């Protein structure tokens, strides 16, 4: 497994198109990514790959679906068991530390509970919800899962 201390270099090496602000954010949030991923039983590299695919490390981004922050969490989907019954606003989710924490909690919960430990199904569920679990093979066709896996492979394979 790769170690997170090299994330800055790996993203710089494998994604030269990233702007200097994005690369700075990778470095800036490494510690939080490592802490929250470990606390939630997921690989830091996987969480970093999710953040890259979701927001390219832009903390202020809001999608057309009202997903907010680095991990692109939709506020209305917070407040359940995934987030320990805490409801978050878009403003709160734009805080990088909060976004990393909440994204890690949701990804971990989805993978453990809904996907029964299956990483790709958990990633699909994080992005597209229940159809990833109920529609047989849906997760295998997910472009999102393929993107995250590609980024993850570069991070892990780049060491």
Segments (PLM) and residue ranges:
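Secretory-pathway/luminal and periplasmic proteins that interact with or process carbohydrate-rich
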Residues: 56-62, 110, 129-139
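Substrate-binding/active-site groove segments that recognize
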Residues: 64-86, 103-105
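Short, functionally critical alpha-helical segments immediately adjacent to catalytic or ligand/cofactor-binding
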Residues: 42-58, 73, 100-104, 122-128
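Export/targeting segments at the very N-terminus of extracytoplasmic proteins
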Residues: 2-57, 97
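A structural signal for well-ordered alpha-helical segments within the folded catalytic domains
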Residues: 27, 31, 45, 97, ...
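Short basic/hydrophobic patches in alpha-helices and adjacent helix-turn junctions
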Residues: 105-113, 128, 150
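Catalytic and substrate-binding regions of cell-wall glycan-acting enzymes that process beta-1,4-linked
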Residues: 117-159
């Amino acid at each position: 497994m790769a170690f997170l201390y090299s994330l800055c270099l790996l993203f710089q090496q494998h994604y030269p198109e990233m702007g200097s602000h994005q690369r700075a954010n990778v470095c800036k949030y490494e510690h939080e990514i490592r802490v929250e991923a470990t606390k939630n039983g997921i690989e830091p590299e996987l969480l970093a790959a999710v953040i890259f695919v979701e927001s390219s490390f832009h903390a202020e981004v809001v999608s057309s679906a009202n997903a907010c922050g680095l991990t692109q969490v939709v506020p209305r989907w917070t407040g359940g068991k995934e987030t320990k019954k805490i409801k978050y606003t878009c403003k709160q989710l734009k805080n990088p530390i909060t976004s990393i924490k909440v994204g890690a909690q949701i990804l971990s919960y989805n993978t453990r509970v809904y996907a029964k430990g299956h990483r790709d199904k958990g990633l699909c569920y994080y992005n597209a919800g229940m159809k990833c679990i109920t529609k047989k093979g849906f997760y295998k066709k997910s472009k999102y899962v393929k993107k995250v896996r590609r980024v993850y492979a570069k991070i892990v394979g780049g060491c």
